[in-house]
Swiss-Prot record:
Gene: PET122
Free-text function comment from the UniProt entry: Required for expression of the mitochondrial gene for cytochrome c oxidase subunit 3 (COX3). PET122 seems to work by directly interacting with the small ribosomal subunit to promote translation initiation on the COX3 mRNA.
Segments of this protein annotated with the region Essential for PET122 function: 185-254
Keywords: Activator, Membrane, Mitochondrion, Mitochondrion inner membrane, Transit peptide, Translation regulation
More about this protein: Present with 468 molecules/cell in log phase SD medium.
InterPro entries: Pet122
Gene Ontology biological process terms, A to Z: mitochondrial cytochrome c oxidase assembly; positive regulation of mitochondrial translation
Example of a GO MF term: translation initiation factor activity
Protein name: Protein PET122, mitochondrial
Main location: mitochondrion
Subcellular location: Mitochondrion inner membrane
GO cellular component: mitochondrial inner membrane; mitochondrion
C-alpha cells in the first residue's frame, strides 16, 4: 500500500508560526497553520503551540492541533501539558476532548512502570473527564449516570487517593440540579444503599453524601440524609460532610 508522507512546513512559515505563538497571537499562528493543509509540523513546534495555547486558553488551537497533527501521527504529549489542555477544553466546552486526552495518555504509557507523578497526572485527567461529562450532561442525564461515570474513573484509581468535593465543582452543580426534582431526590438517597458498581475507595461515598448535603433545603432533610447513610455505612471519612454542615450552619452531630 502506498504511503504518502506530508512534507514539513518551510523554515520561513515555521518561524512565523513560532513567533506568533510566543507573542501570544494564537489566532494568527493558527491561521498560518491552517493555510498549510498539505504539510506537517515538527514535534518541537507542535509542543510549543500546544503549551502556548494551553497557557492562553486558546481552545481552537488545541482542538485543531489535536485532530490534525497529534491523533493522526499518534504523537506523544507530555502528561502535565495534557492536563492543562484538558482544563482549557473543560471550561471552553470542548467536552469530548478530555476523555480523548486521558485515553491517549494511557495508551502512550501502557507498557511502562508508573511513578507518583504519573499517578497524579492520571488522577487529574480522570477528574477532568468526570467534570466534562457532568458539565455536558448537566440537564440531560440522571444523577445515577453521572455517579456511575465518577465511579468508573475515580473509584478505580490505584492507591485509593482522597476524593474531595471541592475538586468536582461541575459534579456538585449537577447534583444540585438533579436534587431539585423529586424523583431524583429519592434516587440520590437510594444510591447510598444500591450501588451501580462495587465501591473500592473509602472516599467515594462520603463525596456523594457531601454533595447531597450541600443541596438539601434545610437541617431536617440533612438529618434524614445522614440517617440514610448511616444505615448502610460506618467508619468512612466524613470530613467533607462535616465541612458542608458547618458551612451551611446546621447544628448536626456527624
Amino acid at each position: 500500500m502506498l504511503t504518502i508522507t506530508k512534507r514539513l512546513v518551510t523554515t520561513d512559515v515555521r518561524s512565523r508560526i513560532l513567533l506568533s505563538s510566543l507573542n501570544g497571537k494564537m489566532s494568527d499562528a493558527l491561521a498560518l497553520l491552517r493555510q498549510q493543509q498539505q504539510t506537517s509540523v515538527d514535534v518541537e513546534l507542535l509542543h510549543t503551540m500546544l503549551a502556548r495555547a494551553a497557557a492562553l486558553a486558546h481552545a481552537d488551537t488545541i482542538a485543531y492541533m489535536w485532530y490534525q497533527h497529534v491523533m493522526p501521527r499518534r504523537l506523544p504529549v507530555e502528561g502535565r501539558l495534557l492536563c492543562e489542555m484538558a482544563g482549557v477544553a473543560l471550561y471552553q466546552d470542548r467536552l469530548f476532548l478530555p476523555a480523548q486526552f486521558l485515553q491517549h495518555y494511557q495508551a502512550m504509557n501502557r507498557d511502562r512502570r508508573t511513578s507518583p507523578e504519573d499517578e497524579l497526572i492520571e488522577y487529574e485527567l480522570r477528574r477532568i473527564k468526570v467534570e466534562a461529562f457532568a458539565r455536558g450532561t448537566m440537564h440531560s442525564t440522571a444523577l445515577r449516570e453521572k455517579w456511575k461515570v465518577f465511579l468508573q474513573e475515580m473509584d478505580t484509581l490505584p492507591g485509593q487517593p482522597p476524593l474531595r468535593l471541592r475538586d468536582f465543582p461541575q459534579m456538585t452543580k449537577a447534583m444540585g440540579i438533579a436534587l431539585m426534582q423529586q424523583d431524583e431526590q429519592a434516587a440520590a438517597l437510594a444510591l447510598f444503599g444500591r450501588q451501580p458498581l462495587v465501591i473500592k475507595n473509602e472516599w467515594s461515598l462520603p463525596l456523594l453524601l457531601a454533595g447531597v448535603l450541600w443541596h438539601v433545603p434545610g437541617p431536617a432533610q440533612a438529618r434524614r440524609v445522614l440517617a440514610e447513610f448511616r444505615q448502610s455505612y460506618r467508619g468512612l471519612p466524613l470530613l467533607d460532610a462535616e465541612l458542608v454542615i458547618k458551612r451551611r450552619g446546621f447544628e448536626i452531630n456527624t
